[in-house]
């Protein structure tokens, strides 16, 4: 058959079965085969698509079928593919469709013979598409035997076998082109095996179609006839490419059947994006099943849900990325309730398209999974202690320091994603597409053991802050966690003699270090000949010291405060009377050393790096100190009854640094500088050499040290304590037991304010040389014990920061990771800004130890020298870690003379020691305020101690608030990455994203340790900090990642401390006040020697602050300046001119300022010439005027020779500046003339210069002329100057017609001409700046005006609005057809019906904006030119004043027909308020000032024009004003027009409230302006249009009573004149108040009824009213007014009175009727 053959010729008969389907499998096969055919077709010709069907067979409709609509996204438009014809031979045995054939066709021989003739006759119908339901009615033609089919296949192609649809599936359809390839039996078997599980036997046989190889276009009609198909379920198969339905071209490429492969829907194996439809497609209605012609895995929650097992999704599978815009989940488009439970099905049932992908691609985030690392074990050969190198320092880690760290940015793993909520979390789908969704895992409980690395470790631990004890935990990384109580007090000894580079693997820490701990600080170098090494005891602490910055001085033990502390714990190891010292040789160091000096808590300064390295405390015995150990006594350990599991050691790297620094010291006379090491061992056995040296001294500690140091005066100052060491030890032991909690809390709170770099060493320890009695020990120095507080010792920082590890960089810089760790440990409100810069270098730690005195000093040392501990610490370590960089170094360092010990005599050194004895750190002493209540005598208390104390206590309360002790649980807390969490992307610190600030209780669900890969939450902390132990349990994710609740502790941490000193970007609390660094040459405000220049500066500063509000105050300041000469006066005038020219808006204010100055400043006489302010002002005006002309010529002149040629842009800019300055000057001149500061002659001269005698003046001059005329025209336009003014305006009129001028200039000329015609009443009068209260008031008026105008919209066009809303909203009823956009399926989700929680916000909350007809003012054609400019709204009233006579911005609503709209507040007349603030507003209405100002000045101008046009008005004016009255008579009154207007408005408002007519009469007398009465009446009547009927009735009664009053406050002429003014502006008033004509007629009717005005006069006013005479009648307004008058008379007086008044007036109603098409309904009642 031909391709272009007509459709009837290519079609075949279609039989339709109306029964319901018997199974889903057949339909799935049909869809599968049709899709496969379409795939082969669409691959070659994607644009081919059939035309819509024109043969809908409605007789076969079923109840469960829905009509197919074009573009249906659910199946109507999507499956429009080119299907092969049913008689194609390939369909019998192609791929998996062989099963469909056997299923549908039935057994051979069942049916009867075929009728070829009938088949030929039925060939006129179109070949239908594949049926989607099975039929229960069988045709007689379906019983075709295979033999008959073969015979038919070999016959003519036109005799196609008739098919009955409903029994055949798309598997039997033949493609457009036939092929001779034999069927592939392997494909059939394979497909049969694949689909055997989903296939059910068919009970209905079907006929075998006859082959027709020539029917190539039959597949184009497969889908046209079927208009509606039942919905079906399809198995998960590979979705082919679907051709868009909008393309109709048929592809000539042969369709090739492709085998359908069952593929899970969730996997990303879709070769092509799924097309749900093209343009103008409609979604299926949700009440019926849909027709799917495309193999899409859909699970419709309806009655025909198939029995197909759902896909199972495992939580641990990798993410499945897929295109989520085009995917549809089950039951989409159906507005059924969504079963959102605690555990949501993985497929997220009933969620629309585009909301969220079913299994979106997860970001490469971190789930807290720990990295498996193989620790390198290093075992010491002597102690066999294991040393691990794979741990990281954590300042807050009290658990295992060798916790496994995850890799940076690992790829997504297939292991189960451990979530972190203690209970299931209800996931609520947001209104937008979230790009991350993690579904709940299986409920398989985890074991109670430690978490393996395959799972995400959770860190549910509280932040260990100030008052909470730090527990000693010593456990391997992979053992079960257990609680380790705080250990017993241990003997803490320090030894820095080792240079072994090793790291301690297991750090332990106690929340309260041993009370009676012994800290021994020994010299870094020990002479080999002074003793042999001894084993160290079990509980010593090694503290490394550096010779750098060490200067030793002797100090008696009695000179120190009694309590001494180690790490915030009372140091109970007081020295005995004799403190023998054991000499310990140096191990692994070549430094020449001195014997160790024994002291209870003596320390020496070390560098920042060394101290921080020394903070590392380990349970294993230090490797580097095995050769030199001191055997301590065990009595201190027995006080607590407990011993620490292992000894506490220091970082060996510190000793190496110390050794290296000692090697670098210069030699002096063969001797090296000697490093002292302070030891706290009290009863350690000593060597003989030490005893020998001690024998030469006295045995009493106080006496000995006093004798050696020679500092007995200072000994008395500090109240020495001569008790024995044992007593002190016992006492301090008791103190420690009693106040363990207190000291632990207080000192650990204070530890954050102490810098780790100052832990061991004070600032200056000086090597004091005193006597020559011990000269037999030239190479050794003996130091007697002294009880020096060691609050800043090395272990102090270790009490809270156990695992802090720092670099040994000589530059003193911190690595960024160490800074971040410090940020985590510093507290909750650390400054983010400080996280980007390292702390400052410690000034004290960088000092280099210099040679002592001279070269002959060391060999001559005869006595033991005691190491003085200067209690001034190097630096405070505040709780906020970044504040270490902000603590001022000069504030904490010692006196300058303490450094002078590097050279000089021994007396100088002793003096320095004396000066440093009292140099205690203020912050250091405040830490022990609870115990050390008394300061030493002579202690210099600085004022900032109190501030530091307050900060310390606030920090303590902060820690108490944030601490969550949970005894009995393992606190294996990791270092927090809170600082890094605020930065959205930082690869360098990715491992900190998985660390948590604390644990999470149930209810917060916890997004602990999860980072959604290089993104996340920026600006807030991710992890709420709360308590909770680590418990292995099923963990849940938190819904959308990266968010934080409002009232979480994270926000509290940022908000806490907001009252502290601000630093950087964020507040940093708990920081001492930073000392200001004073510059050598500080900035000072420059002083002026010249007195005249000082005056000018003072005057300029005053003028800069000049505003209308502070005018009087600043004027007094100017008068206070001594202006006593012409130079000063000229300077004042020049500055006033400069300000006025640059700010033309304030010209009136500056002119007023000059007017006041002229009267206040005296005259001067210089050189016999009288100098006045006016004279200088006039000269300045002339100078500026001429200067403008010169500058304009220079700007327009081409550059001469020798001058730099200016570009056109530069010349234009200069021209603009000159023009702006000239305009300001002209305006100022005019304002000065208005103040009578200049003469009229000068004004005429200026006008003549601006007009020029030539015919073409510059546009700038014309603009200046128009500005000057608008300013002073009303004053110079009088009878004497009439001839001159006429000449000016004749020339201006001529210039306005010249086309050479710009349109802007021509309009300005026209406006000036109109202004003179209107008697100089400006439409937009500019009178200078407003006060701030006026600006606020006008802004409120404008807002109210706009709101009132918008509020009239619904009443005027509500019906159209409702129709629009019904059409555009999906909420319309069933009969309302929504627009195509509402039904079309899109990638944003299908339209949903009205149901619970599935409302589409895209249509409901959208504001409806529609065009609204705004009536335009009707203007008659007149001679006057049209003036363009802002006529109201926001164009006026914001920065200028606009006084007017009457307003026509009537704010009436269309709903006022029934008595007015009482809900709308009254609008204002203009932008001016009342001068009587006590006047109330009636009925809660707003003042008239709140009305719009659209046509205020137009009305005023119209009123003035009408005055000239009406002879009656002119005669009335002459009667009122007399023959000598002129136009300027109102200006001659005592009150200005603006004041009269304000008084009249305030009076009428007060009358509405109080209803006191006498008050109105008194106000009119106070006004004393009878000529203003018509204007006042016009204002009152116009204002009443915005008020209620009751107030209008009161106004009508008031007008009648005023006319009838005895004092004749008003007369009939004034009343008529006022009514005439209202009628002149009635056309504009109706625009804002549609019923203004009716309201005015009622007032007129009241006046006629009371016989104040006759009806004849009212009729005349109506006929002559309007902008043009007769315009009111022409537009129908006159008829409305007259009809309202007659209606009012009828209501008030009755029908008889109305007839009598009409007869007597002689008015003809026909004369007031408007011409067609206008009409007056009110007037028609009386015709």
From Swiss-Prot:
Acidic residues composition-biased segments: 1202-1211
Cell membrane in keyword set: no
Region EIF4E-binding, annotated ranges: 916-928
Biased composition (Low complexity): 25-38, 79-97, 699-712
Domain MIF4G, chain residue ranges per copy: 1096-1319
Keyword annotations: Initiation factor, Phosphoprotein, Protein biosynthesis, Translation regulation
Limits of the MI domain: 1539-1663
Family affiliation: Belongs to the eukaryotic initiation factor 4G family.
Protein name: Eukaryotic translation initiation factor 4G
């Amino acid at each position: 058959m031909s391709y272009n053959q007509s459709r009837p010729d290519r079609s075949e008969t279609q039989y339709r079965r109306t029964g319901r389907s018997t199974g889903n499998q057949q339909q799935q096969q049909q869809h599968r085969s049709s899709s496969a055919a379409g795939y082969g077709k669409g691959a070659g010709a994607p644009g081919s698509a059939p035309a819509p069907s024109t043969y809908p067979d409605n007789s076969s409709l079923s109840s469960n079928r829905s009509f197919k609509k074009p573009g249906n996204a659910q199946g109507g438009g999507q499956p429009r593919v080119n299907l092969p014809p049913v008689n194609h031979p390939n369909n019998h045995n192609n791929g998996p469709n062989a099963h469909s054939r056997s299923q549908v066709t039935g057994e051979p021989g069942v049916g009867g013979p075929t009728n070829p003739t009938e088949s030929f006759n039925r060939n006129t119908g179109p070949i239908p598409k594949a049926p989607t339901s099975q039929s229960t009615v069988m045709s007689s033609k379906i019983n075709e035997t295979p033999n008959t089919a073969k015979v038919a296949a070999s016959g003519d192609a036109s005799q196609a076998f008739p098919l009955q649809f409903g029994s055949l599936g798309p598997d039997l359809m033949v493609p457009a082109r036939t092929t001779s390839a034999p069927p592939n039996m392997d494909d059939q078997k394979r497909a049969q095996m694949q689909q055997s599980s989903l296939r059910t036997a068919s009970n209905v046989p079907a006929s075998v179609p006859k082959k027709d190889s020539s029917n190539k276009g039959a597949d184009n009609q497969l889908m046209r006839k079927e208009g509606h198909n039942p919905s079906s379920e399809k198995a998960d198969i590979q979705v082919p490419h679907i051709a868009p339905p909008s393309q109709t071209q048929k592809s000539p490429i042969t369709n090739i059947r492709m085998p359908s492969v069952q593929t899970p829907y969730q996997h990303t194996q879709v070769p092509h994006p799924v097309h749900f439809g093209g343009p103008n497609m409609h979604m299926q209605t949700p009440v019926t099943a849909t027709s799917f012609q495309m193999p899409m895995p859909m699970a419709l929650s309806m009655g025909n849900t198939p029995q197909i097992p759902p896909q199972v999704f495992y939580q641990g599978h990798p993410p499945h990325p897929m295109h989520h815009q085009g995917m549809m989940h089950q039951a989409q488009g159906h507005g059924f309730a969504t079963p959102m439970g605690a555990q949501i099905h993985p497929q997220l049932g009933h969620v629309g398209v585009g909301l969220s992908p079913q299994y979106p691609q997860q970001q490469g985030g971190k789930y807290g999974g720990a990295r498996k690392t193989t620790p390198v074990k290093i075992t010491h050969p002597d102690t066999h202690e294991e040393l691990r190198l794979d741990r990281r320092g954590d300042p807050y880690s009290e658990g295992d320091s060798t916790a496994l760290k995850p890799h940076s940015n690992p790829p997504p793993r297939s292991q189960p994603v451990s979530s972190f909520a203690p209970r299931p979390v209800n996931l609520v789908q947001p209104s937008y597409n979230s790009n991350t969704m993690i579904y709940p895992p299986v409920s398989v409980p985890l074991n109670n053991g430690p978490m393996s690395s395959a799972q995400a470790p959770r860190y549910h631990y509280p932040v260990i802050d100030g008052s909470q004890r730090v527990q000693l935990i010593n456990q391997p990384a992979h053992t079960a966690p257990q609680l380790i109580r705080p250990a017993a007090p241990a003997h803490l000894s320090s030894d820095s003699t080792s240079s072994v580079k090793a790291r301690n693997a297991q750090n332990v820490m106690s929340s309260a270090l041993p009370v009676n701990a012994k800290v021994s600080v020994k010299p870094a170098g020990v002479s080999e000949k002074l003793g042999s090494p001894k084993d160290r005891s079990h509980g010593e602490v090694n503290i490394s010291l550096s010779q750098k910055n060490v200067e030793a001085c002797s100090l008696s033990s009695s000179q120190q405060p009694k309590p001494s502390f180690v790490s915030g714990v009372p140091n109970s190891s007081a020295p005995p009377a004799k403190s023998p010292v054991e000499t310990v040789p140096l191990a692994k160091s070549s430094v020449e050393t001195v014997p160790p000096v024994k002291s209870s808590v003596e320390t020496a300064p070390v560098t920042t790096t060394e101290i921080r390295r020394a903070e590392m405390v380990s349970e294993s015995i230090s490797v580097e100190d095995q050769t030199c150990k001191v055997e301590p006594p065990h009595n201190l350990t027995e006080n607590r009854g407990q011993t620490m599991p292992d000894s506490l050691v220091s970082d060996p790297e510190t000793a190496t640094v110390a050794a290296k620094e000692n090697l670098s010291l210069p030699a002096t006379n063969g001797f090296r500088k000697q490093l002292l090491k302070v030891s706290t061992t009290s009863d350690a056995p000593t060597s003989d050499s030490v005893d020998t040296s001690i024998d030469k001294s006295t045995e009493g500690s106080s006496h000995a040290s006093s004798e050696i140091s020679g500092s007995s005066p200072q000994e008395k100052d500090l109240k020495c304590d001569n008790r024995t060491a044992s007593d002190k030890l016992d006492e301090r032991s008791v103190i420690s037991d009693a106040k363990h909690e207190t000291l632990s809390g207080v000192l650990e709170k204070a530890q954050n304010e102490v810098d780790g770099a100052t832990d061991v060493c004070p600032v200056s320890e000086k090597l004091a040389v005193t006597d020559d009695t011990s000269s037999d020990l030239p190479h050794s120095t003996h130091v007697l014990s002294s009880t020096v507080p060691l609050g800043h010792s090395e272990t102090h920082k270790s009490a809270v920061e156990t695992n802090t590890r720092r670099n040994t960089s000589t530059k003193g810089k911190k690595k960024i990771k160490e800074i971040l760790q410090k940020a985590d440990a510093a507290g909750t409100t650390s400054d983010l800004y400080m996280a980007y810069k390292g702390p400052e270098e410690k000034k004290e730690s960088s000092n280099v130890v210099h040679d002592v005195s001279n070269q002959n000093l060391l060999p001559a040392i005869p006595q033991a020298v005691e190491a003085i501990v200067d209690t001034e610490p190097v630096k405070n370590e505040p709780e906020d870690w970044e504040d270490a960089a902000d603590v001022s170094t000069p504030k904490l360092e010692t006196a300058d003379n303490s450094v002078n010990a590097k050279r000089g005599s021994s007396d100088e050194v002793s003096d320095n020691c004396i000066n440093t004895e009292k140099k205690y750190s203020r912050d250091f002493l405040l830490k022990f305020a609870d115990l050390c209540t008394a300061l030493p005598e002579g202690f210099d208390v600085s004022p900032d101690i109190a501030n530091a104390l307050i900060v310390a206590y606030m920090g303590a309360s902060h820690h108490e608030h944030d601490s969550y002790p949970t005894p009995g649980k393992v606190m294996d807390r990791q270092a927090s990455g809170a600082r890094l969490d605020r930065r959205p992307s930082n690869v360098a610190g990715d491992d900190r994203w998985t660390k948590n600030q604390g644990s999470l209780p149930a209810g917060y669900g916890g997004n602990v340790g999860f980072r959604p890969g290089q993104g996340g939450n920026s600006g807030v902390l991710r992890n709420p900090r709360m308590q909770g132990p680590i418990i292995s349990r099923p963990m849940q994710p938190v819904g959308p990642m990266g968010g934080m609740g409002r009232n979480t502790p994270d926000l509290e941490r940022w908000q806490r401390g907001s009252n502290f000193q601000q630093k950087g970007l964020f507040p940093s609390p708990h920081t001492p006040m930073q000392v200001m660094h004073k510059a050598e040459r500080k900035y000072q405000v420059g002083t002026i020697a010249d007195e005249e220049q000082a005056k000018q500066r003072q005057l300029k500063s005053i003028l800069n602050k000049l505003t209308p509000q502070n005018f009087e105050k600043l004027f007094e300041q100017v008068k206070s300046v001594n202006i006593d000469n012409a130079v000063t006066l000229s300077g004042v005038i020049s500055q006033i001119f400069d300000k006025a020219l640059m700010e033309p808006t304030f010209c009136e204010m500056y002119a007023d300022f000059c007017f006041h100055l002229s009267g206040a400043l005296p005259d001067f006489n210089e050189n016999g010439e009288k100098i006045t302010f006016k004279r200088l002002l006039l000269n300045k005006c002339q100078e500026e005027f001429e200067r403008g002309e010169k500058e304009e010529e220079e700007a327009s002149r081409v550059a001469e020779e020798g001058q730099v040629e200016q570009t056109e842009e530069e010349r234009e800019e200069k021209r603009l500046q000159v023009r702006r300055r000239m305009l300001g000057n002209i305006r100022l001149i005019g304002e000065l003339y208005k103040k009578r500061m200049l003469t009229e002659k000068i004004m005429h001269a200026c006008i003549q210069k601006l007009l020029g005698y030539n015919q073409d003046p510059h546009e700038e001059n014309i603009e200046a002329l128009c500005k000057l005329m608008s300013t002073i025209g009303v004053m110079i336009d009088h009878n004497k100057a009439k001839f001159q003014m006429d000449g000016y305006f004749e020339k201006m009129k001529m210039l306005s017609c010249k086309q050479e001028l710009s349109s802007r200039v021509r309009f300005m000329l026209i406006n000036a001409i109109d202004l003179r015609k209107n008697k100089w009443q400006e439409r937009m009068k500019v009178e200078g700046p407003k006060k701030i209260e006026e600006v606020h008031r006008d802004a409120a008026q404008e807002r109210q005006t706009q709101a009132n105008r918008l509020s009239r919209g619904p009443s005027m066009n509500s019906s159209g609005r409702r129709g629009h809303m019904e059409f555009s909203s999906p909420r319309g009823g069933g009969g309302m057809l929504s627009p195509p956009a509402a039904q079309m399926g899109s990638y944003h989700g299908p339209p949903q019906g009205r149901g619970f929680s599935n409302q589409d916000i895209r249509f409901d909350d959208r504001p409806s904006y529609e065009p609204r007809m705004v009536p335009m003012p009707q203007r008659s054609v007149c001679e006057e030119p049209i003036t363009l400019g802002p006529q109201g709204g926001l164009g006026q009233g914001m920065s200028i004043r606009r006084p007017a006579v009457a307003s026509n911005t009537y704010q009436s609503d269309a709903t006022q027909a029934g008595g007015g709209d009482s809900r709308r507040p009254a609008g204002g007349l203009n932008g001016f308020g009342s001068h009587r603030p006590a006047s109330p507003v009636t009925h809660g209405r707003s003042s008239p000032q709140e009305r719009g100002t659209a046509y205020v000045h137009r009305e005023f101008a119209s009123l003035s024009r009408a005055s000239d046009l009406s002879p009656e008005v002119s005669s009335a004016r002459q009667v009122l004003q007399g023959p000598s009255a002129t136009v300027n008579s109102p200006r001659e009154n005592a009150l200005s027009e603006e004041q009269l207007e304000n008084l009249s408005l305030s009076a009428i408002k007060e009358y509405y409230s109080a209803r006191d007519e006498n008050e109105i009469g008194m106000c009119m007398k106070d006004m004393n302006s009878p000529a203003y009465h018509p204007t006042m009446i016009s204002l009152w009547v116009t204002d009443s249009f915005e008020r209620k009927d009751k107030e209008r009735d009161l106004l009508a009664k008031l007008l009648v009573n005023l006319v009838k009053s005895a004092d004749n406050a008003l007369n009939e002429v004034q009343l008529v004149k006022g009514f005439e003014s209202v009628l002149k502006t009635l056309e504009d008033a109706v625009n804002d108040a549609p019923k203004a004509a009716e309201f005015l007629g009622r007032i007129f009717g009241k006046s006629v009824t009371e016989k104040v005005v006759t009806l004849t006069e009212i009729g005349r006013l109506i006929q002559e009213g309007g902008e043009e005479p007769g315009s009111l009648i022409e537009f129908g307004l006159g008829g409305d007014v007259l009809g309202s008058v007659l209606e009012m008379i009828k209501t008030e007086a009755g029908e008889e009175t109305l007839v009598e008044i009409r007869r007597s007036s002689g008015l003809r109603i026909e004369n007031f009727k408007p011409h067609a098409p206008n009409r007056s309904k009110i007037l028609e009642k009386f015709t």
